[in-house]
Amino acid sequence: MIKRIDRVNELIKQELSKLIGEYFKLKDILITVTRVKTEPDLRSAEAFISIFPFAKAEETLKQFKEILPRIQHILDGTIELKYIPKIQLFLDESLEYESNIERLLDKIKDSKMKH
């Protein structure tokens, strides 16, 4: 069952990424589906997206959630499963977290070089 869930996760991730590219084009904003976690009963799935630049993430996520019903409807027609999971969107903040860690490490490195 786990392998099936993994395949469903990957399928939803690919289809969602494709639909984002087709229906959600914003200038100077990059949206990436980083992972999908589908429940074992296939009734719901959490999709995590990263948005760059991060400063526009909340606003962009809000806009994306507004068109999610349309994207869900399209997914219902393109994915061949008995049940198409209902997608919930979440902001994946891990890339921003990593970026902050790198900035802090760079500051420490710079301060050590100055002393």
Region locations from a protein language model:
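Charge-rich, low-complexity N-terminal segments
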Residues: 1-44, 50-115
